A protein has these predicted regions:
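Extracellular/periplasmic carbohydrate-active domains that bind, remodel
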Residues: 1-420
Length: 420
């Protein structure tokens, strides 16, 4: 697949055939508000007070030189080549013939389009509501949702089978398949799914609260003898549905992934967490809206034993943490020993939710986290670092600056402390 990720000399960029999205760390000496100049082939292309910039109306398959400067000199420079223009695979056209009426379930048609998608092709969703069950993506592919297009997961648990190896609340286990599944979980290995783009102006949504309730009810029945025999364990959990609730799927599950770019979309109503990346590297999420109002454990963006994960210019309306930085729980997370590090969160806004959190699952360690220019005033927690007494692990090198926060909390919590 033509490369869409570039990182060099202090700058990182993602590109399409006609655009480049560029970002950089805020300089240590910068004030709360600074102006940056972006030069494209030695000519000023943009002035911005943000630490990111998108340049559009570029030429496909063209090499550009980028340079960012501010009052104290250079931020960095980067040479980048835009991708070729991709051929569109319209999901409504033959041989897929998906129906965007909000009623027909298109799982087979959409999976065929995904399976057919090559590295120089793009799966295209025109406006419409495309109902589906679980879908499995592969390396070197792109989904593009046009404005008004909704990829809508059903609320039927049967549509999220088979169960897959996953990790929830710090423990590896079998969970329902997510709406979108990228990669296969393996804590002993590197990436097995790479170079995937999810972008556009549309929405990727799942069954939300109703799907969660149905899965929990089914799992509660399946585990009724175990729950009855382990009443003491159940009493130490957050609530009676904690254990049966752990098999719920995420909205987008990224296991052992690398070079994943999510841009411009609305992600909504996973049955638990929305965007979950575990044992993954180089995940970029920008200019997205994440919604999970009323969903229990409805986290927005969760890097978990992952590295080089960046989110910026995003809005959150979540039923739990907007961002939750994790790395496993209790002995298992410590033994697996895959820390989360090199995390960047900037220019993000909370309209509802719990804010930005590190933990409580962090026994694999968390380090090198930088957060700046975020508004978490409308959140219940603001910034929270939380652990339990038996976690182990570490949290270090966390830098937070130029943010509006409702609270700052560093504390021990008494829930979610069971584990292998």
């Amino acid at each position: 697949m033509p490369n869409h990720f570039f990182s060099q000399n202090g700058l990182t960029a993602c590109c399409t055939d006609t655009s480049i999205t560029l970002f950089w760390d805020k300089p240590a000496a910068a004030g709360a508000v600074e102006t940056y100049t972006v030069l494209l082939d030695d000519a000023a292309a943009a002035h911005t007070q943000k630490t990111h910039c998108t340049l559009e109306n570029l030429r496909p398959e063209t090499t550009y030189s980028l340079f960012v400067q501010w009052r104290s000199g250079s931020i960095g420079e980067l040479t980048i080549r835009t991708t070729p223009t991709k051929r569109c695979l319209d999901v409504t056209a033959s041989p897929y013939s998906a129906v965007g009426d909000g009623k027909a379930v298109n799982t087979a048609a959409l999976q065929k389009a995904i399976d057919d998608c090559g590295e120089r092709e793009q799966i295209y969703f025109p406006a419409g509501v495309y109902c589906t069950g679980t879908l499995r993506l592969h390396s070197n592919m792109e989904l593009y949702l046009e404005e008004g297009a909704v990829l809508q997961g059903t609320a039927d648990p049967e549509d999220y089978l088979p169960r897959i190896s996953s990790r929830f609340e710090g423990t590896e286990m079998e969970c329902y398949s997510s709406l979108l599944n990228l990669g296969t979980l393996d804590h002993t290995a590197g990436p097995n799914c790479e170079n995937v783009i999810l972008r556009g102006k549309g929405t990727i949504a799942s069954g939300g609260k109703l799907l969660a309730e149905r899965i929990i009810a089914s799992e509660r029945e399946r585990l009724k003898d175990y729950l009855a025999q382990n009443a003491t364990l159940v009493s130490t959990c957050e609530n009676a549905d904690t254990i049966p609730g752990r098999v719920r799927p995420r909205l987008v599950n990224m296991s052992n992934c690398r070079n994943i770019w999510m841009e411009g979309l609305t992600f909504a109503n996973g049955a638990s967490w929305n965007l979950h990346m575990v044992y993954s590297d180089q995940i970029v999420t920008d200019h997205c809206t994440i919604r999970s109002d009323g969903v229990w454990n409805g986290d927005g963006w969760d890097p978990d034993s992952s590295t080089n994960c960046t989110i910026f210019a995003c809005e959150f309306f979540t039923g739990d943490d907007a961002v939750a930085i994790k790395s496993g729980k209790n002995p298992e997370g410590n033994i697996i020993d895959r820390p989360t590090k090199h995390i960047r969160v900037f220019d993000c806004h909370s309209g509802f939710g719990h804010g930005i959190c590190i933990g409580s699952e962090m026994s694999g360690g968390v380090e090198d986290v930088k957060i700046w220019d975020c508004d978490m005033a409308v959140s219940t927690s603001g910034l929270e670092i939380k652990v339990t007494k038996k976690r182990g692990g570490y949290v270090r090198n966390v830098e937070v600056r130029d943010c509006t926060l409702s609270h700052v909390m560093v504390h021990s919590v008494g829930y979610n402390d069971d584990g292998i």
